[in-house]
UniProtKB/Swiss-Prot annotation:
InterPro entries: 4pyrrol_synth_GluAld_NH2Trfase, Aminotrans_3, Aminotrans_3_PPA_site, PyrdxlP-dep_Trfase, PyrdxlP-dep_Trfase_major, PyrdxlP-dep_Trfase_small
Catalytic activity, as annotated: (S)-4-amino-5-oxopentanoate = 5-aminolevulinate
Gene Ontology MF terms in the entry: glutamate-1-semialdehyde 2,1-aminomutase activity; pyridoxal phosphate binding; transaminase activity
Residues with the N6-(pyridoxal phosphate)lysine modification: 266
Subcellular location: Cytoplasm
Pfam family, one: Aminotran_3
Family per record: Belongs to the class-III pyridoxal-phosphate-dependent aminotransferase family. HemL subfamily.
Listed name of the protein: Glutamate-1-semialdehyde 2,1-aminomutase
Length: 435
């Protein structure tokens, strides 16, 4: 029973659009009643109806240590005692900036903001200001936040301008946003051939987290780096999801590619609202007050958020942190796949350290957006609700990645696998491949 969640959801819809403050939370993609959470600890969520869930959302990625980690809570509590916001510099800003640069050497200077959207939006403004060019290239299926210039659908052909994907976004705002195909270098090269003198930057997720985790092919990212070098454009990695999750140095360290700018978020705030963008010194020096490109924020560098973020990043330096996280992720995903195969369930998966994507499809590998959107959404909805009913909380969307934390143990992973095995063994026939 979810009586209290249902009552709160009904009440919330009187005061907030859709009853939520971020659309995916409304369960619109899966149906049913969104769970209202009252407490979280380690790998678990507890809702207002006192039901406990193994959590594979992790607040959409920030909670790499698990919920309510003692070191993070202590750091935030100590910071709160000194005040919630100063509107002035604090020492922890310097400490966090230095640690970010230590983890990601491509970031020689960094600017703190309050969200991933602010980070990508500001990085693009900086790229345009530095290059004196107006156009940017993004990729179909990659999500970089809700800034107007990034809410774009692909046009009717590879060389067309983008079209707004949301009412309220003026056509003129997105006409400088060019859309290419992820993992298709030829589509990018074609845009450069036509608009070579106008392209300020490419922005890309090195591992795309909002089309159910599709990693870039290594030669694809290498090719993007080479095209940017050739045409004098900047390469921006959106590592809001992957930064400090897939590796201490982010996805860029796995691919051994140095972007000009990097957008960060989620983990760097330890669960607090934080984003950041940084990169080469000579580029970052063009930001005000040193340079002419303006960007500011009342709550940027908030002392409580800086303390929580600093405490989180320090924990990531523990011995074998990432090898242990990767091992747990692999145990979970390979266990799911083996159970799906045994039950003849059409399922494939992509995963990296601490993050995974499940797609109900008979295709063995999913490497393109077109493949991801052709996954069976109805199968996912059924799977999602069966998991939820059995105490496992997944992202309420067939296109969102799942996350696993350092707080998850083999106990939680194995319990999850037992639940999945049972679900697959009794699932409706429409979940099975014909044999």
């Amino acid at each position: 029973m979810v009586d209290h969640s249902a009552a709160l959801f009904n009440k919330a819809q009187n005061y907030m659009p859709g009853g939520v403050n971020s659309p995916v939370r409304a369960f619109g993609a899966v149906g049913g009643v969104p769970r209202f959470i009252k407490k979280a600890s380690g790998p678990y969520l507890i809702d207002v109806d006192e039901k406990k869930y193994i959590d594979y959302v992790g607040s959409w990625g920030p909670m790499i240590l698990g919920h309510a980690h003692p070191a993070v809570i202590q750091a935030a509590q100590e910071a709160v005692q000194n005040g919630l916001s100063f509107g002035a510099p604090c020492e922890n800003e310097i400490k966090l900036a230095a640690l970010i640069g230590e983890f990601m050497p491509s970031i020689e200077k960094v600017r703190m903001v309050n969200s991933g959207t602010e980070a990508t939006m500001s990085a693009l403004r900086l790229a345009r200001g530095v290059t004196g060019r107006s156009k940017i290239i993004k990729f179909e299926g990659c999500y970089h936040g809700h800034a107007d210039c990034l809410l774009v659908n692909a046009g009717s052909g590879a060389l067309t301008f983008g079209m707004p994907s949301s009412p309220g976004v003026p056509l003129g705002t997105v006409q400088d946003t060019l859309t290419a195909t992820f993992n298709d270098l030829d589509s990018v090269a074609a845009l450069f051939e036509k608009y070579s003198k106008d392209i300020a930057a490419i922005i890309v997720e090195p591992i795309a987290g909002n089309m159910n985790l599709i990693p870039a092919a290594p030669d694809f990212l290498t090719g993007l780096r080479e095209l940017c070098n050739q045409y004098g454009s900047l390469l921006i990695f959106d590592e809001v999801i992957t930064g400090f999750r897939v590796a201490k140095g982010g996805a860029q360290s796995l691919y051994n590619i140095r972007p000009d700018l990097t957008a960060l978020g989620k983990i760097i705030g330890g669960g607090m609202p934080v984003g950041a963008y940084g990169g080469r010194r000579e580029i970052m020096n063009q930001l005000s007050p040193e340079g002419p490109v303006y960007q500011a924020g009342t709550l940027s560098g908030n002392p409580v958020a800086m303390a929580a973020g600093l405490a989180t990043l320090k924990e990531l330096t523990a011995e074998n942190f990432y090898s242990n996280l990767k091992e747990k992720t692999e145990r979970l995903v390979m266990g799911i796949l083996s159970r799906a195969k045994a039950a003849k369930i059409p399922l494939t998966a992509n995963f990296s350290c601490g993050i995974f994507g499940l797609i109900f499809t008979s295709e063995e590998r999913v490497t393109r957006y077109a493949q991801a959107v052709n996954g069976n959404v109805e199968h996912f909805r059924s799977f999602f609700h069966k998991m939820l009913d059995n105490g496992v909380y997944l992202a309420p969307s067939a296109f969102e990645s799942g996350f696993i934390s350092a707080a998850h143990t083999n106990k939680e992973v194995d319990k999850t696998l037992d639940i999945i095995e049972n679900i697959f063994s009794v699932s409706e026939t429409y979940l099975r491949i014909s044999v």
